[in-house]
């Protein structure tokens, strides 16, 4: 998924990868993936991921769950609760659910005809909050977000920024 989609230049973003930091994180072994095959293990794996991200050599932990019985709303509520607890500890969690169609505008840079995953899965991405904020600010200054639909920007970047009040 990372090599075949996230790291490749994306025409909708001016041939910049969807995540400009993904290739380096993967190549440096700074990416950890925790697979969940039974949804009742999801909460424990997320907590395990919050421990793994504390390692200074880890940039991102992805908890991927293929047993999707949790709804988009339930996942978002769960992750919000975790963020209230973990953002003060410099840990940020972001949910990605395959059935989430929150955006009013299509997010073309997240759609591809070239590659499809073998199965559907939800993800929880876990990163250091301050490091993510700095990287996001650098990308903003370079114009990276200029091509993002406004509602997608609000649901990702502005949503993360709303947790700043818990950090300091």
Segments (PLM) and residue ranges:
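Expand to "…catalyze enediolate/carbanion chemistry for C-C bond making/breaking, isomerization
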Residues: 1-168
């Amino acid at each position: 998924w990372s090599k075949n989609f996230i790291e490749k230049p994306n025409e909708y973003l001016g041939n910049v990868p969807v995540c400009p930091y993904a290739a380096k994180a993967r190549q440096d072994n700074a990416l950890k993936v925790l697979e969940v095959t039974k949804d009742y293990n999801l909460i424990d794996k997320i907590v395990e991921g919050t421990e793994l991200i504390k390692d200074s050599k880890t940039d991102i932990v992805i908890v991927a769950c293929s047993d999707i019985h949790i709804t988009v709303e339930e996942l978002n509520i769960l992750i919000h609760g975790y963020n209230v607890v973990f953002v003060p500890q410099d840990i940020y969690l972001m949910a990605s659910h395959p059935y989430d169609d929150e955006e009013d505008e299509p997010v073309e840079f997240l759609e591809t005809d070239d590659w499809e995953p073998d199965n559907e899965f939800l993800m929880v991405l876990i990163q250091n909050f301050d490091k993510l904020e700095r990287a996001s600010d650098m990308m903003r200054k370079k114009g990276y977000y200029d091509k993002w639909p406004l509602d997608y920007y609000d649901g990702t970047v502005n949503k993360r920024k709303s947790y700043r009040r818990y950090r300091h």
